[in-house]
Swiss-Prot record:
Family: Belongs to the TRAFAC class TrmE-Era-EngA-EngB-Septin-like GTPase superfamily. EngA (Der) GTPase family.
Species name: Mycobacterium avium (strain 104)
Gene (name only): der
Protein name, entry field: GTPase Der
Function: GTPase that plays an essential role in the late steps of ribosome biogenesis.
UniProt domain EngA-type G: residue ranges: 30-193, 203-376
């Protein structure tokens, strides 16, 4: 294996399989969340930590984006840095939104960096976030950003008032003080993430979808009708997070149910608030039920939520809610919309339900079980390559640049979701990879789970001698 991930000889295969298997079994890296109000330099700090420009940075308050996680490495230690993004706030909604950001970070991170603008000083929003973080019991580091002079460093000292201990004066833009901050953060991190889901225990389910699609109603129907709520599991000092519900002779953990039960206010930025909640629930789940309003046209927001689930690699069940409101004409129109808008999701089990009346709600359990079984599936290397040989012989990859790439070998690098690596002599077009995914599903099932197909191109034999 070469430094850039290409490979040079068939003798590398066993080593590559071992390497991939080790990576798949590696314990989850600890997570550091970067939080703070808009325009304090969160994304700039994330980019500085990563050593590359990944997070969106714009010199205006509230570049509206979603929370994103990146793999990072510092002094030989792996960790994940979580950029909590920004929003377009107004004075009325800002404090609530920063507080929500902090509470999500408490649940999803092992340590938190609160970024404050040292030139502005502590604001009421900063104070609200600090109060929540202080109650978390997790390591919290105060980064006093935009410190580019001795005077600014003196201003940073005033941030002691937040009660988070000594402020760390930094300049995310120029790198000043960031190394010292990171050294302290990593010294406080556990070797293995303490917030990552542990194997075993009840399977974790998230109910997500656009506002007013019926998430709370479905949760109440599942819990109330079955009379089977075991208890609410205390998650943080802010609110209970998960609910354990017995369905189909097993207990399921429905994650972030506090977010479903609390109504989101009409303050500016509430869409970001909902997006943070959705990301948090998806990250914590193994299988995600995406609720879609069957009585109304599919929306861009529906598509965004579905994209979040696919990108996170979670098992997926589609629940078309409000079926009691759907007449025959709407059903025909909906089928056409699904064929047009969700053509890439034909693998996801679909259940037509009414959370209000309870129609077909019981069918969600077998759909979740099917999706999770697929999500957990591993295909042995022998059968996988026998299948691949037949498929490629019947439909070889298209010619690219006058040459036809050959697929020499395949292995499943991971499950949850099933992830495959193809070793080739050249690049494979996206269309051909989609074709292989369809054939994989035909041969091995995978109903209810995304599949990832990665390509590693073999290095030319003379490349390493040049």
């Amino acid at each position: 294996m070469t430094h850039d991930g290409t490979w040079s000889d068939e003798s590398d295969w066993e080593a590559v399989e071992f390497e991939l298997d080790e990576a798949a079994q590696a314990p989850p890296a600890p997570v550091v969340a970067v939080v703070g109000r808009p325009n304090v330099g969160k994304s700039t700090l994330v980019n500085r930590i990563l050593g590359r420009r990944e997070a969106v940075v714009q010199d205006v308050p509230g570049v509206t984006r979603d929370r994103v996680s990146y793999d990072a490495l510092w002094t030989g230690r792996r960790f994940v840095v979580q950029d909590t993004g920004g929003w377009e706030p107004d004075a009325k909604g800002l404090q609530q939104l920063v507080a929500e950001q902090a509470s999500v970070a408490m649940r999803t991170a092992d340590a938190v960096i609160l970024v404050v603008d040292a030139l502005v000083g502590a604001t009421t929003a900063d104070e609200a976030a600090a109060r929540i973080l202080l109650r978390s019991g997790k390591p919290v580091f105060l980064a006093a950003n935009k410190v580019d002079s001795d005077k600014a460093e003196a201003d940073a000292a005033m941030l002691w008032s937040l009660g988070l201990g000594e402020p760390h004066p930094i300049s995310a833009m120029h790198g000043r003080g960031v190394a010292d901050l990171l050294d302290e953060v990593l010294a406080a991190l556990p070797e293995v993430s303490e917030v990552a889901p542990r194997p075993g225990g009840p399977r974790r389910v998230a109910l997500v979808g656009k506002p007013n699609v019926g998430k709370s109603s479905l949760l109440n129907k599942l819990a109330g009708d079955q009379r089977s709520v075991v208890h609410d599991v205390a998650g943080t000092t802010v609110d209970p997070v998960d609910s354990l519900i017995e369905l189909g002779d097993r207990v399921w953990r429905f994650v972030d149910t506090a977010g479903l039960r609390r109504k989101v206010g009409q303050a500016s930025g509430h869409e970001f608030y909902a997006s943070v909640r959705t990301h948090s629930a998806i990250d914590a789940a193994e299988v995600v039920i995406v609720l879609i309003d069957a009585s109304a046209p599919l929306t861009e927001q529906d598509q965004r939520v579905l994209s979040m689930v696919i990108e996170a690699g979670r098992a997926l069940v589609l629940a078309f809610n409000k079926w009691d409101l759907v007449d025959e004409d709407r059903r025909e129109l909906l089928e056409r919309e699904i064929d047009r808008e969700l053509v890439q999701l034909r693998w996801a089990p679909r259940v037509n339900i009414s959370a209000k009346t309870g129609r077909a709600v019981a069918k969600l359990v077998p759909a979740m079980e099917t999706a999770l079984a697929s999500w957990d599936t591993r295909i042995a290397t022998g059968p996988l390559n026998s299948w691949l040989k037949e498929v490629v012989a019947a439909t070889p990859p298209p010619v690219r640049g006058g040459k036809q790439p050959r697929i020499l070998f395949a292995t499943q690098a991971a499950a949850r979701p099933p992830t495959f690596v193809l070793f080739t002599t050249g690049f494979l077009e996206a269309g051909y990879r989609r074709f292989l995914e369809r054939r994989l599903r035909e041969a091995f099932g995978f109903e209810g789970t995304p599949i990832r197909i990665n390509v590693r191109v073999r290095e030319k034999r003379g490349a390493r001698r040049r």
